[in-house]
């Protein structure tokens, strides 16, 4: 990835509550993106398990990571807490039991620099506890690129 491409900064907000089993895989998938200019915001929503310590560990090993520890107030409030401190040109939200393809933000960069969208919708796979894909959602690219007036109608 060349230096010019690294100029666009993406903030990634991960609200975290009681997902100790999945958290390292989630954070690892964000930290190891091929596109590096990321601000990663881990919002510990008062998680009662080992997640708070895991968040602090990740912040120690990667300086792109910021951690917010707060009293449990639910998913929406956790996302808003991350949004409050985000400094990126674009902001992405993922659930903390998700993991993403290592080239996701490289592809997002290509979309935002060629189409300048206000919103991007991602496809996803639902996997069971054994890692087997049980459902696929892939948005049709043509149907997800709208002009502002189309979105409001």
For each of these PLM feature ranges, what is it?
Residues 1-153:
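Nucleotide-sugar donor-binding/catalytic module of glycosyltransferases
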């Amino acid at each position: 990835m060349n230096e010019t491409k690294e100029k666009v900064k993406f903030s990634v907000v991960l609200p975290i509550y009681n997902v100790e089993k999945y958290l390292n895989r989630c954070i690892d998938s964000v930290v190891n993106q091929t596109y590096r200019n990321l601000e990663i915001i881990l919002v510990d929503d008062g998680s009662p398990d080992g997640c708070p310590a895991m968040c602090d560990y990740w912040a120690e090993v990667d300086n792109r990571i910021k951690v917010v520890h707060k009293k449990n107030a639910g998913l929406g409030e956790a996302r808003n807490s991350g949004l409050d401190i985000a400094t990126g040109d674009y902001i992405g939200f993922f659930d903390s039991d998700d993991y993403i393809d290592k080239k996701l933000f490289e592809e997002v960069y290509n979309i935002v620099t060629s189409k300048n969208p206000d919103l991007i919708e991602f496809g996803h796979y639902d996997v069971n506890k054994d890692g087997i894909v049980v459902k696929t959602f892939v948005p049709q690219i043509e149907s997800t690129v709208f002009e502002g007036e189309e979105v409001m109608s």
